[in-house]
Amino acid sequence: MEVITDRLDDIVKQNIADEKFVDFVIHGLEHQCPAILRPLIRLFIDILLFVIVIYIFTVRLVSRNYQMLLALVALVITLTIFYYFIL
C-alpha cells in the first residue's frame, strides 16, 4: 500500500511541475504578442490543451474497451434496423 501512495505522491508532484512549466510557456507566448491579442492567445491555448486531453482520453478509452464499443455499435445498428424495417 505504501508503494501506491508513494507513486501517487510522485504523480501529483510531477503534475504540479508540468503545470508550472506550461504556465511559464503560456506566459512567454502571451508577452510576445500585442496586448489586444493576449486573450485570444489564451483562448487558443486553452482550446488546444482541451483537444489534446480529449484525444488522449478517447485513445485510451478505445484501446482499453474496443470489444465493448464494438458490441455497443452492433447493438445500435441492430436496434436501428429493427426500428426502421420491422416497426
From Swiss-Prot:
Major subcellular location class: virion
Induction info: Expressed in the early phase of the viral replicative cycle.
InterPro entries in UniProt: Prot_L2
Bilayer topology: Multi-pass membrane protein
Pfam families given in the database record: Chordopox_L2 (PF05803)
Keywords in alphabetical order: Early protein, Host cytoplasm, Host endoplasmic reticulum, Host membrane, Membrane, Transmembrane, Transmembrane helix, Virion
Claim: rRNA-binding is one of the keywords in the record: no
Subcellular location per the Swiss-Prot or TrEMBL entry: Virion membrane; Host cytoplasm; Host endoplasmic reticulum membrane
TM spans (from-to): 39-59, 67-87
One GO CC term, this protein: host cell endoplasmic reticulum membrane
Subunit structure: Interacts with OPG158/A30.5.
Family membership: Belongs to the orthopoxvirus OPG096 family.
Protein task: Early protein involved in virion morphogenesis. Participates in the formation and elongation of crescent-shaped membrane precursors of immature virions in cytoplasmic factories.
Protein name: Protein OPG096
